[in-house]
Amino acid sequence: LVECPECGASHRADHLVEDATDVEDAEALPGEEVAELIADNDIACPACGTPLAGEPVEAFNLMFATDIGPGDAQPGYLRPETAQGIFVEFPRLKEYARGNLPFGITQIGPAYRNEISPRGGLLRLREFTQAELEQFIDPEEDEPPLDRVRDVEVRLYPATEQEADDGDYLTTTVGEAVDEGVIGSPWVGYYLGVAQEWYERVGVDTDRFRFRQHLAGERAHYAADCWDAESEVDGDWIEIAGFAYRGDYDLSKHDEYGDDAF
């Protein structure tokens, strides 16, 4: 978050940097670096044109806070993602699956994020709909049907290539990417292959489509690895799906702090 000293407008500093420079993933950078980029590139407030050089860049909580109940109400937050509903119900869902792994749960529903500067038509809203699949596996026992998508060709943009001065896309097959460790989890590789086939069937232009790996600085705290399916629209790369290997982060935290056994 950066605020204009003249008109008081608030802006997402990373978005200002991305719009004014060749930096694609400013969200992954520390606030100090974003502030330096704002100063070095003479970025001004979009609302009034006042230079923003020297203004502090601060973290901002994207969760909507609210009060639950009357009187001395308990604090609560609107969910920023739909996934936690699945994790909270994991003990019951496992019973429904007769205790057998792997099993998957799909859902669709609303999520809420207190965006600093909503923009991009329907691409960045404060209330939006998410659809997702959470697949629960035993990483030591369960293997995906990788052979079904082993020969599917994908265009990858790994973190190593993003950080290299002359980095470029890696066009390869799902099988080769998993075998060579470009994609760390065979389960992630499997779902990237399934998604690639689906996007091709529905008519996505594969010349303007890629899977981009999250940089370490932008990867969510719960994710051991994460890739985004992105499509180029009017010169901007737009995330249309995320593929995260969450490990046992969510279930272990609910087990640690909740009353049920996870």
Where are these regions (language model features)?
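TRNA-recognition modules of translation machinery and tRNA-sensing kinases, especially anticodon-binding
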Residues: 1-262
